[in-house]
């Protein structure tokens, strides 16, 4: 610690919506935290300016004192310095009040009490002081509803199934107990023991975001963390780097399986496993990969956590089959979107009507960037991108055909405000945190209620207001029904007309059909049919001319 940096620190006024005036009185909790911070800082200053070691805390009887003695003394000092503040949640009655306020539903056996503040974890779980410091420095001051419940459950060593709205702090909810548990269990272990923490996510973009938060929280701690990127995978395969040097790995399923099958990564020591966006990872296309990973995590006391904004009953059944007596936490309604999102359904009649609707929104001032527009396919995303370029909008497109580096660059530019409108497929529908997105437009209706909740969850994050507009045509009359149900559960009945609600309910077969088969749609274009026909005729004439020339060349050679 740099003592001169501490002594030269000045005051700083933090911009916050919670501070109404310059002279507003701090809350009891703020006073408590500031006093605790001041005491800790004062002790560190006293300790570092005691250059001649005259104070008791640095005295030693001989120069031969063992490392263990120093460790014990340091632990005693920490206990004296960090007297835990009183718990905010102390009784069952306190927990009932908190759960009612947070709309939390918790089921299972022997459920731990929730926490009311991050400081509660000091007294109850001896939360690492540096981890708490990293949290507060990153301005994570108050736990969200999902964090209040999931942190004590996970730190008590219980398996967890957690469902909470998008933007509610789920990443932090699983990273804090993951780090804390490994800090405790890693004491006394040899160096390069191996991977003990594993986080699985369905997309590379989400994995990068999780890794970035992991780096912030582990700052100053002896935990080696990594994201299994293409570059790291190559190094592991070529034995340039050994996987055993890492404590925590964040990865997508397929890349991890490839490395495991090549015997370059050992998952048998994994103590903490987190499956983020569990509904996606247990859906078709991912379930076999997820199952393969689980089969390699053979540690007998492994703790498993599953998080998502939507967890269908089928996924929950699978979760119960691979977990030990899990606790289930639902924040809000299971299939509802965040209540900070104003949702609206717009009937456009046809594909051409969608483009007209967007242009009308621009003219009427409803089009307020930053905006994300979702489409069902790469082909359609590219087509809309070219159409909006003609309208001179500051727009870019991101999809699976672009390289990871290109996607990272586009995301970075969008976050920095260089891009106002981002067109994408479902590759960005999950987990990726874009702060300040004003609106999400579903240009194409998503195929499931879960996909809808995740898409619109890119706005209205962290308690901020957001808007979600979904365009639909006659072809979408089946696919739009689950969305109406989500809107009802989210309290957005005003966002759709009465005749939409009266549409007949979908049968199971219809739901399956909509889920697994994309709707055939016309190409996105405002070019008149006559012009299209002339273009086609011209292309055919050019093609016929080329063929004639090729035949003439062949005949001449003969």
From Swiss-Prot:
GO molecular function, one term: ATP binding
Record GO biological process: endonucleolytic cleavage in 5'-ETS of tricistronic rRNA transcript (SSU-rRNA, 5.8S rRNA, LSU-rRNA); endonucleolytic cleavage in ITS1 to separate SSU-rRNA from 5.8S rRNA and LSU-rRNA from tricistronic rRNA transcript (SSU-rRNA, 5.8S rRNA, LSU-rRNA); endonucleolytic cleavage to generate mature 5'-end of SSU-rRNA from (SSU-rRNA, 5.8S rRNA, LSU-rRNA); snoRNA localization
Comment, domains: The Q motif is unique to and characteristic of the DEAD box family of RNA helicases and controls ATP binding and hydrolysis.
Organism of origin: Scheffersomyces stipitis (strain ATCC 58785 / CBS 6054 / NBRC 10063 / NRRL Y-11545) (Yeast)
Cellular component GO terms, alphabetical: cytosol; nucleolus; small-subunit processome
Domain of life: Eukaryota
Keywords assigned by UniProt, alphabetized: ATP-binding, Helicase, Hydrolase, Nucleotide-binding, Nucleus, Ribosome biogenesis, RNA-binding, rRNA processing
EC number: 3.6.4.13
Basic and acidic residues compositional bias, start-end: 34-53, 64-81, 538-558
The name this protein goes by in its record: ATP-dependent RNA helicase ROK1
């Amino acid at each position: 610690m740099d003592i001169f940096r501490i002594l030269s620190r000045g005051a700083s006024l933090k911009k916050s919506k919670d501070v109404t005036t310059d002279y507003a009185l701090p809350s009891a909790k703020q006073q408590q935290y500031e006093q605790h911070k001041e005491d800790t800082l004062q002790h560190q200053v006293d300790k570092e300016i005691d250059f001649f070691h005259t104070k008791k805390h640095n005295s030693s009887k001989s120069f031969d004192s063992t490392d263990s003695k120093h460790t014990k003394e340091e632990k005693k000092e920490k206990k004296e310095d960090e007297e835990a503040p009183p718990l905010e949640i102390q009784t069952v009655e306190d927990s009932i009040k908190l759960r009612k306020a947070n709309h939390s539903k918790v089921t299972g056996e022997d459920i731990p009490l929730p926490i009311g503040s991050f400081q509660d974890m000091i007294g109850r779980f001896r939360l690492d002081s540096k981890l708490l410091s990293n949290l507060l420095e990153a301005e994570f001051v108050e736990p969200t509803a999902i964090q209040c419940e999931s942190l004590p459950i996970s730190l008590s060593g219980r398996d967890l199934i957690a469902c909470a709205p998008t933007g509610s702090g789920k990443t932090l909810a699983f990273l804090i107990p993951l780090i804390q548990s490994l800090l405790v269990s890693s004491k006394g272990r040899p160096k390069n023991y191996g991977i003990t923490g594993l986080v699985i996510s369905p997309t590379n973009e989400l994995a990068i975001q999780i890794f970035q938060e992991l780096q912030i929280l582990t700052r100053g701690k002896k935990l080696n963390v990594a994201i299994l990127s293409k570059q790291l995978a190559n190094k592991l395969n070529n034995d340039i780097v050994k996987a055993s040097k890492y404590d925590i790995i964040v990865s997508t399923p397929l890349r991890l399986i490839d490395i495991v099958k090549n015997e370059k990564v050992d998952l048998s020591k994994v103590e903490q496993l987190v499956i983020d966006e569990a509904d996606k990872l247990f859906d078709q296309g991912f379930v076999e990969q997820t199952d393969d990973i689980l089969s390699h995590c053979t540690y007998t006391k492994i703790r498993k956590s599953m998080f998502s904004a939507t967890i269908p009953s089928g996924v929950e059944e699978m979760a119960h089959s691979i977990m030990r007596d899990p606790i289930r936490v639902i924040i809000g309604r299971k299939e509802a979107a965040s209540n900070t999102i104003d949702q609206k359904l717009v009937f456009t009649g046809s594909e051409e009507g969608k483009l007209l609707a967007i242009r009308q929104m621009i003219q009427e001032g409803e089009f307020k960037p930053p905006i994300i527009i979702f489409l069902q396919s790469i082909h359609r995303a590219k087509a809309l991108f070219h159409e909006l370029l003609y309208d001179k909008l500051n727009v870019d497109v991101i999809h699976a055909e672009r390289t990871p580096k290109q996607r990272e660059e586009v995301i970075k530019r969008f976050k920095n405000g260089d891009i106002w409108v981002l067109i994408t497929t479902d590759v960005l529908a999950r987990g990726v945190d874009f702060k300040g997105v004003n609106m999400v437009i579903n240009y194409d209706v998503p195929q499931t209620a879960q996909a809808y909740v995740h898409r619109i969850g890119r706005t209205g994050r962290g308690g901020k207001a957001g808007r979600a507009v979904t365009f639909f045509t006659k072809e979408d009359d089946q696919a739009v029904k689950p969305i109406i149900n989500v809107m009802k559960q989210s309290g957005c009945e005003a966002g759709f007309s009465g005749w939409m609600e009266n549409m007949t309910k979908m049968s199971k077969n219809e739901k399956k059909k909509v889920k697994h088969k994309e709707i055939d749609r016309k190409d996105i274009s405002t070019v008149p049919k006559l012009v299209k026909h002339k273009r086609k005729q011209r292309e055919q004439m050019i093609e016929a001319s080329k063929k004639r020339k090729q035949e003439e060349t062949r005949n001449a050679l003969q």
